[in-house]
From Swiss-Prot:
GO terms for molecular function: FMN binding; NADP binding; NADPH dehydrogenase activity. Its EC number is 1.6.99.1. It comes from the Bacteria. It comes from Listeria monocytogenes serotype 4a (strain HCC23). This is NADPH dehydrogenase. FMN binds at S22, P23, M24, C25, A59, Q101, R214, G306, R307. The gene is namA. Catalyzes the reduction of the double bond of an array of alpha,beta-unsaturated aldehydes and ketones. It also reduces the nitro group of nitroester and nitroaromatic compounds. It could have a role in detoxification processes. Homotetramer. Substrate binds at Y27, H163, A164, A165, H166.
Length: 338
């Protein structure tokens, strides 16, 4: 059997293969209430039917002010749980594990009213200027991640991912470009890491399942975070109980990175080796042979697929065929699934 289609354990959760659907915002909430819709059900469950091992839902806001837009999913209140539970049940029906990415947009929120950030620095000249979070407000953000994690558990999710990448709130704290604070949340790397550490520890108080953290391994900007900065961050995350790091790049500033097949894989490789922690690789991974090479050369532990799963819900089936394997599909499709 190929490594791509071997099982993988995240703590006590066993994935049937190493294909993960990347969290990707769909901006499809209908009533600006954060509640998942029929679109979300069809979108995610179809990828589970296609053979994906772990489906991670898009950035789901822990506070109403933490949405990227008014059309994002949320877990800031109990009314948002039932629709997510229905979705999780659909994923489980098809043999996939269910993950959810808990997030706060910080200064990248495009919402009416006040937005917040570690420091009062806007994303760009066209963006609203955020209000600097007080220490009390930071503690409330941490508490809301904990509350959202509890609701995720109530909905039946198997895995939680904390979004610390792409220029959103936690990433804003981590990077010296966006964090100019002079208290114990700013300055040295250990201080800038504090909010993420506090969130991980708070989540673990109500959640005993695996925790993944998504990071941006480089800011692609002078004075920003580079790969070498993420090795100590990754070591601290491992010590705090994180199972795996989902390694992306960019998003903090308005810079277009160089993009080519597998362009982010070297970052996952270096963090894996430098910090001794499992990683997920992503970045234009589109074929089974490409994914298999990454795993067999121990450059990452999981393959996180984004745009290719938007184009093809049956990526897992096609990847298996490319590797000379056959995987079991939905029994309803047996006449065509060969």
């Amino acid at each position: 059997m190929s490594k791509l289609f071997s099982e993988y354990k995240l703590k006590d959760v066993t994935l049937k293969n190493r294909i993960v659907m990347s969290p990707m915002c769909m901006y499809s909430v209908e009533n600006k209430d954060g509640i998942a819709t029929d679109f979300h059900f069809a979108h995610y469950v179809s990828r589970a039917a296609g053979g994906t091992g772990l489906v991670i839902l898009e950035a789901t806001a822990v506070q109403e002010v933490g949405r990227i837009s008014e059309f994002d999913l949320g877990l800031w209140n109990d009314e948002q749980v039932p629709a997510l539970k229905r979705l999780v049940d659909g994923l489980h029906y098809h043999g996939a594990k269910a993950g959810i990415q808990l997030a706060h947009a910080g200064r990248k929120a495009v919402l009416p009213g006040e937005i917040v950030a570690p420091s009062a620095i806007p994303f760009d000249e066209k963006s609203a200027k955020p209000v600097e979070l007080t220490k009390e407000a930071i503690k409330e953000v941490v508490a809301d991640f904990k509350r959202a994690a509890y609701r995720a558990k109530e909905a039946g999710f198997d895995v939680i991912e904390i979004h610390a990448a792409h220029g959103y709130l936690i990433h804003q704290f981590l990077s010296p470009i966006t964090n100019r604070r002079e208290d114990n949340y700013g300055g040295p790397a250990g201080n800038r890491y504090k909010i993420l550490s506090d969130i991980i520890k708070a989540v673990k108080e109500v959640w005993d399942g695996p925790i993944i953290v998504r990071v941006s391994a480089t800011d692609y900007a002078h004075g920003g975070l580079q790969l070498e900065d993420h090795i100590p961050f990754a070591k601290w995350m491992k010590a705090d109980g994180v199972e795996l790091i989902d390694v992306s790049t960019g998003g903090l500033v308005n810079v277009a990175p160089p993009v080519f097949p597998g362009y982010q894989v070297p970052f996952a490789d270096e963090i894996r080796r430098g910090a001794g922690i499992a990683t997920g690789a992503l970045g234009l991974i589109t074929r089974g042979e490409q994914a298999e090479e990454i795993l067999c050369n121990e450059r990452a532990d999981l393959i996180i697929v984004g745009r290719e799963l938007l184009r093809n819900p049956y990526f897992a089936k096609d990847a298996a065929e490319q590797l000379g394997e056959t995987i079991e599909g939905p029994k309803q499709y047996s006449r065509a699934w060969k």
